[in-house]
UniProtKB/Swiss-Prot annotation:
Chain ranges for the short sequence motif 'HIGH' region as given in the UniProt record: 32-42
Subcellular location, principal: cytoplasm
UniProt-listed Enzyme Commission number(s): 6.1.1.16
Protein name: Cysteine--tRNA ligase
Cofactor binding mode and count: Binds 1 zinc ion per subunit.
GO CC, alphabetical: cytosol
Residues bound to Zn(2+): 30, 213, 238, 242
The encoding gene: cysS
Alphabetic keyword roster: Aminoacyl-tRNA synthetase, ATP-binding, Cytoplasm, Ligase, Metal-binding, Nucleotide-binding, Protein biosynthesis, Zinc
Binding-site residues, ATP: 273
């Protein structure tokens, strides 16, 4: 088992991973609130932790992966009422849709997917423990709040000082006169008319959002576990509040390592329904093969913000198609012949990239070089070497969950064919990128852009007057 480093959000640096139990990793990732179809931001979180777990398991780690489902929430109640259906009908439908989307993206199912409504008793036990310890208090209206000033380390994950904080619009913090401090957060909400509720020592009601994850994670993995993950938007207040209530309740450190996946912007702007640039996974799959979406996500480092656009998806399709063409060229000559003797130099370079905070951008660069060597070996009819390189490439793409479809079926797929046609403006933009690359003497990038355009039906010709282009016949 090769040692690896990961970026711990709490420490704000890359650190070497040390397991609580030798050879084992317990991981909890915040899942979806199931009131609508999953969007591309959800896709990134699902895919990122999927390839991370695939890689760790390929290294011999025994990973226990928990991803929760929030099936009781203000948004769920509102949507069910708008639709005139029960909460269970709504959540069941969108849980099924979520699982279908995840499967289409090539994501393995988590070892366990606890639902919030299945852990109400455990949530109440944790809340009662916090009240008994003086870290939480019941309000006169039946709500129960966590008292943030009673937890000295509050703000350590997000790097915020309590006195400097200001509530943000997206922070899901209820502002109530019953609070002792503006940042006290609700653990138990009193029952309201036409809302689901459960009996409790504080009256009928339902759990707050944050307590759900603390109860589910500790019930599934214990009071102290290895890795907690989620989207960057959850760092504050959700994960900050999880730490406070969990550690105040158990008296133990909650999590050793925090991992957060970066944002997805759409055409340079934050994805938002109000901006009209909000896309569900299903929206995107109408234009692009789901493995193209996965490739787009895998090709960037999980912590880096990425820009989602049709151009980016077209580039992803072109790049992914290269691997399929290489596999097809090999299979036409050698069939499905493989060998257990893999090229260890490529394996080592790939593993080194992934062991450095799961650097898939660097890992993909290794795969492109390997793909190029495979094409050369097939062209030069070097059968033994071609088989080793093909087997190595297949092994490594499997770890990333790529090139998982039948070669001919993928290449014949018409998903996204209309979207693949580059506009004139997009072509001119690529040409300018190529000019800039040549000026910087980055000839490899310049050649890559030329080849990418050629594969998309655009022919470049360099003349004394500059580069001209035409669409291939």
């Amino acid at each position: 088992m090769q040692p690896f480093v990961l970026y711990n959000s709490e420490q704000r640096k890359k650190v070497e991973f040390v397991p609580r139990k030798e050879g084992h990793i317990d991981m909890y990732v915040c899942g979806m609130t199931v009131y609508d179809y999953c969007h591309i931001g959800h896709a990134r979180v699902m895919v990122a932790f999927d390839y991370i777990i695939r890689f760790l398991r390929s290294q011999g780690w025994k990973v226990r992966y928990i991803r929760n489902i929030t099936d009781i929430d203000d948004k769920i109640i509102k949507r069910a009422n708008e639709n005139g259906e029960t909460i269970q009908q709504l959540t069941t439908r969108f849980i099924d849709a979520m699982n279908e989307d995840a499967a289409n993206l090539g994501c393995l199912a988590p070892d366990e997917a606890p639902k919030a409504t299945e852990y109400i008793d455990q949530m109440q036990n944790m809340i009662g423990n916090l009240v008994n310890k003086g870290a939480a208090y019941p309000a006169s209206n039946g709500d129960v709040y966590f008292e943030v000033t009673k937890f000295e380390k509050y703000g350590r994950l997000s790097g915020r000082k309590l006195e400097d904080m200001q509530a943000g619009a997206s922070e899901r913090v209820d502002v109530e006169v019953e609070k002792k401090h503006p940042f006290d957060f609700v653990l138990w909400k009193h029952a309201k008319e036409n809302e689901p509720s459960w009996a409790s020592p504080w009256g009928n009601g339902r759990p707050g959002w944050h307590i759900e994850c603390s109860a589910m994670s500790t019930c599934c993995l214990g009071n102290h576990f290895d890795i907690h993950g989620g989207g960057s938007d959850l760092m504050f207040p959700h994960h900050e509040n999880e730490i406070a209530q969990s550690e105040a309740s158990t008296g133990e450190q909650y999590v050793n390592y925090w991992m957060h996946v970066g944002f997805i912007n759409v055409d340079g702007e934050k994805m938002s329904k109000s901006l009209g640039n909000f896309f569900t996974i299903r929206d995107v799959m109408e234009k692009f093969h789901p493995e193209v979406i996965r490739y787009f996500i895998v090709s960037s480092h999980y912590r880096s913000p990425v820009n989602f656009s049709d151009v980016a998806l077209k580039e992803a399709k072109t790049s992914l198609t290269r691997f399929y063409h290489s596999f097809k060229a090999y299979q036409q000559v050698y069939g499905q012949t493989t060998t257990e003797a893999l090229d260890q130099s490529f394996i080592e370079r790939f593993n080194n990239a992934m062991c450095d905070d799961f650097n898939t951008a660097e890992a993909m660069a290794v795969l492109f070089e390997l793909n190029k060597e495979l094409n050369r070996a097939v062209k030069e009819e070097q059968a033994d070497q071609a088989t080793v390189l093909y087997s190595t490439l297949r092994h490594l793409t499997n770890i990333l969950g790529l090139v998982q479809h039948n070669v001919d079926d993928f290449l014949k797929s018409d998903i996204g064919q209309d979207a693949l046609a580059l506009s004139d403006a997009e072509i001119e933009d690529f040409i300018q990128q190529r000019v800039d690359a040549k000026k910087a003497k980055d000839f490899a990038k310049a050649d890559s852009i030329r080849q990418s355009l050629l594969e998309q039906g655009v022919v470049l010709e360099d003349t004394r007057q500059g580069t001209v282009w035409r669409r291939a016949d």
